[in-house]
Curated annotation (Swiss-Prot):
Disulfide bonds: none annotated. Na(+) binds at residues 40, 45, 441. It comes from Balaenoptera borealis (Sei whale). Its EC number is 7.1.1.9. The gene is MT-CO1. Heme a3 binds at residue 376. This is Cytochrome c oxidase subunit 1.
């Protein structure tokens, strides 16, 4: 019975729960890696004593957080749980493929861990650029294991993407148009299309790297007529859509949270929100070389990528101001979920502004590979994606579990986390502006103060993570059951009770076609 339910599951709710648990666990691993990094950088001089090991930590931290924490939780966890409920579908379109998508992740994670256990580990950075990732600078199986890990995670995501696209397009009630689906459903749809179009390019790139390493091909080796810059183009053609994949489901969740706790029945500017997400998805594919301003592109190429990158700020601004407009005039309920959402809006905007700075190719030549870039993407990930995940978690936890969190503890948790992440990453802007480079385990004494403060912030965030574990434990032991949920008329996922029955919508949902 246990095996049938959890190993061979075809139920979107159970698979969503598996994704959430796996992502939470991987998040702990990724947090551990980040704390080792910050411990090393807490003061000048060496702690770990081996720069290869330091770079392995940095690489593993990135891979774990991206592929095994943010994506499984946002797309696999929230996506699986909420999309079928929100469109009135009995399950996902391909329930067994859904199960396979999940079970490809633990082996993938195992391969990534194995890569750091053999030889010297993969100290390449998450970009895995050759020639550093080639078989001279990284002899041994480490990088090969990392590549296989990425292949499995990629297959998992591609299958999941096919599943979500099919489900969202095909499994709505006949009377429901695409423009009647909630914004979270749209965000998952756009995310799935991005995954489907970008991951095969990554697969091609890392497969060529694999053959360069093992079969003497020279795709990325100038000695045989190859070009390492080709790898960078292939990688970033995936890598840039990937960062939008990481944030788009968060956009969808924030729209729901802001609308709900503003007491509104719908978000401000639904169509604008939808097309902003679609625009972001499209533009995400035509700006990749802004990660490569320092490789010596023509000035006109740099001008194009600078301009195109800045254009993304427009649909993003549409979303930010629509969230603020949704809040405007609302009957605001100061719940922990809304606090996460407001934190998201502010900090994501700050991260977006530093992104506009980096979009300027002339400035980026100077700032590339400094801590300014680290600060930028951690503002949009560690305070964008993660805040969205936390907001979504405290908002939908009663739906998933049937129990309510202790609101006071949840607010305290938010405050500690808010202080921790800002103390960690705000000083890194200063470090970058004064020229401290990324991916080094040591630094000149001049950078000591801000690094020490940054490392202190990371340990404050650690206490927040530990408090979160306590809060979840407290909810499950106190067993405060959900009595009623407001605004179910425009929040369909709550309609079946908390938690919903194992099978929902066993007969087709009724949709009033006169809805406008």
């Amino acid at each position: 019975m246990f095996m049938n339910r959890w190993l061979f599951s075809t139920n979107h709710k159970d698979i969503g729960t598996l994704y959430l648990l796996f992502g939470a666990w991987a998040g702990m691993v990724g947090t551990g890696l980040s704390l080792l990094i910050r411990a090393e950088l807490g003061q000048p001089g060496t702690l770990i004593g081996d720069d290869q090991v330091y770079n392995v930590l940095v690489t593993a931290h990135a891979f774990v957080m991206i592929f095994f924490m943010v994506m499984p939780i946002m797309i696999g966890g929230f996506g699986n749980w909420l999309v079928p409920l929100m469109i009135g579908a009995p399950d996902m379109a391909f329930p067994r493929m859904n199960n396979m998508s999940f079970w490809l992740l633990p082996p993938s994670f195992l391969l990534l861990m194995a890569s750091s256990m053999v030889e010297a580990g993969a100290g390449t950075g998450w970009t895995v650029y050759p020639p550093l990732a080639g078989n001279l600078a990284h002899a041994g199986a480490s990088v090969d294991l990392t590549i296989f890990s990425l292949h499995l995670a990629g297959v998992s995501s591609i299958l999941g993407a096919i599943n979500f696209i099919t489900t969202i397009i095909n499994m709505k009630p006949p009377a429901m148009t695409q423009y009647q689906t909630p914004l979270f459903v749209w965000s998952v749809l756009v995310t799935a299309v991005l995954l489907l179009l970008s991951l095969p390019v990554l697969a091609a790139g890392i497969t060529m790297l694999l053959t360069d390493r093992n079969l003497n091909t020279t795709f990325f080796d100038p000695a045989g007529g190859g070009d390492p810059i080709l790898y960078q183009h292939l990688f970033w053609f995936f890598g840039h859509p990937e960062v939008y994949i990481l944030i788009l489901p968060g956009f969808g969740m924030i729209s729901h949270i802001v609308t709900y706790y503003s007491g509104k029945k719908e978000p401000f500017g639904y169509m604008g929100m939808v097309w902003a997400m679609v625009s972001i998805g499209f533009l995400g594919f035509i700006v990749w070389a802004h990660h490569m301003f320092t490789v010596g592109m023509d000035v006109d190429t740099r001008a194009y990528f600078t301009s195109a990158t800045m254009i993304i700020a427009i649909p993003t601004g549409v979303k930010v101001f629509s969230w603020l407009a949704t809040l405007h005039g609302g009957n605001i309920k100061w719940s922990p979920a809304l606090m996460w959402a407001l934190g998201f809006i502010f900090l994501f905007t700050v991260g977006g502004l530093t992104g506009i700075v980096l979009a300027n190719s002339s400035l980026d030549i100077v700032l590339h590979d400094t801590y300014y870039v680290v600060a930028h993407f951690h503002y949009v990930l560690s305070m964008g994606a993660v805040f969205a995940i936390m907001g979504g978690f405290v908002h939908w936890f009663p739906l998933f579990s049937g129990y309510t969190l202790n609101t006071t503890w949840a607010k305290i948790h938010f405050m500690i986390m808010f202080v921790g992440v800002n103390l960690t990453f705000f000083p890194q802007h200063f470090l970058g502006l004064s020229g401290m480079p990324r991916r080094y385990s040591d630094y000149p004494d001049a950078y000591t103060t801000w690094n020490t403060i940054s490392s202190m912030g990371s340990f404050i965030s650690l206490t927040a993570v530990m408090l979160m574990i306590f809060i979840i434990w407290e909810a499950f032991t106190s067993k405060r059951e959900v009595l009623a949920v407001d605004l179910t008329s425009t929040n369909l996922e709550w309609l079946n009770g908390c938690p919903p029955p194992y099978h929902t919508f066993e007969e087709p949902a009724f949709v009033n076609p006169k809805w406008s």
